[in-house]
UniProtKB/Swiss-Prot annotation:
Keywords: Amino-acid biosynthesis, ATP-binding, Cytoplasm, Glycosyltransferase, Histidine biosynthesis, Nucleotide-binding, Transferase
An example Gene Ontology molecular-function term: ATP phosphoribosyltransferase activity
Taxonomic source organism: Sulfurimonas denitrificans (strain ATCC 33889 / DSM 1251)
Name of the protein this chain belongs to: ATP phosphoribosyltransferase
Subunit structure: Heteromultimer composed of HisG and HisZ subunits.
Record's function text: Catalyzes the condensation of ATP and 5-phosphoribose 1-diphosphate to form N'-(5'-phosphoribosyl)-ATP (PR-ATP). Has a crucial role in the pathway because the rate of histidine biosynthesis seems to be controlled primarily by regulation of HisG enzymatic activity.
Family: Belongs to the ATP phosphoribosyltransferase family. Short subfamily.
Subcellular location: Cytoplasm
Annotated pathway: Amino-acid biosynthesis; L-histidine biosynthesis; L-histidine from 5-phospho-alpha-D-ribose 1-diphosphate: step 1/9
Recorded domain comment: Lacks the C-terminal regulatory region which is replaced by HisZ.
Claim: Cytoplasm is one of the keywords in the record: yes
Highest taxon of the lineage: Bacteria
Listed Gene3D superfamilies: Periplasmic binding protein-like II (3.40.190.10)
One Pfam family named in its UniProt record: HisG
Length: 209
């Protein structure tokens, strides 16, 4: 049996739909339950930020999580497959009309993704003061807390509604199937079997597009 960590919300639903396509059974969590047991799989419903942690510590054999979260956390897990879902960007946003100038002294950047932000500016040899926030990131430039933000952007509508605009894309993210390194060895046949099955679904979807 494989234990699968899924993030709560849309990604969990989309992933379970893939399993339904593959196995023909109904896969759905009972109301408020966090564990779904089937003959071949045990699904765990966890916070998005915790998926890779469950997989890294082998509380789950495999999991589904956004590439942005993987890059931010830097945990040593195997990235098996890009699921081509949950596509978004990590981008820099500023107040509309303001100039994106990395030569400006004492740049302040607000973000919940401190490590991605730090790497981006270090690669450009730019010294910045990173302010970690946990939500309502768009507020920071509006009240003078920060010059710019680094945040996940899907359509950009949230930034626009708050008088901000995207000035630079840092990375494109999508959901990934990941595996624990020990599980990949101990349960290699099972892991590779589900990998191949899911890959066939993703490949078929891409041909239709």
């Amino acid at each position: 049996m494989l234990t699968v960590a899924l993030p709560k919300g849309r990604i969990a639903q989309e992933t379970l739909e893939i399993f339904e396509t593959l196995f023909g059974d109904g896969f759905a969590f009972d109301d408020r339950k966090l564990i779904l047991e089937t003959p071949k799989f045990r699904f765990l419903l966890v916070r998005n930020q915790d998926v890779a942690t469950y997989v890294f510590h082998q509380a789950a054999d495999i999991g589904v999580v956004g590439l942005d979260t993987l890059e931010e956390q830097g945990l040593d897990v195997i990235r098996l497959l890009d699921l081509k879902r949950g596509i978004c960007k990590v981008a820099i946003g500023m107040k509309k009309g303001e100039k994106f100038d990395l030569n400006k002294p004492e740049i302040k950047v607000a973000s919940k993704m401190v490590n991605i932000t730090k790497r981006y500016f270090e690669e450009r040899a730019v010294s910045v003061d990173i302010i970690k926030l946990y939500g309502s990131i768009e507020l920071a430039p509006l009240i003078g807390l920060a010059d710019m933000i680094v945040d996940v952007v899907e359509t950009g509508s949230t930034m626009k509604q708050n008088g901000l605009e995207v000035v630079e894309d840092i990375m494109t993210s999508s959901t990934y199937l990941i595996a624990n390194k020990n599980s990949y060895i101990a349960k290699k046949d099972e892991v590779l079997d589900i990998y191949e099955k899911i890959k066939s679904v993703i490949d078929a979807e891409q041909k239709i597009k």
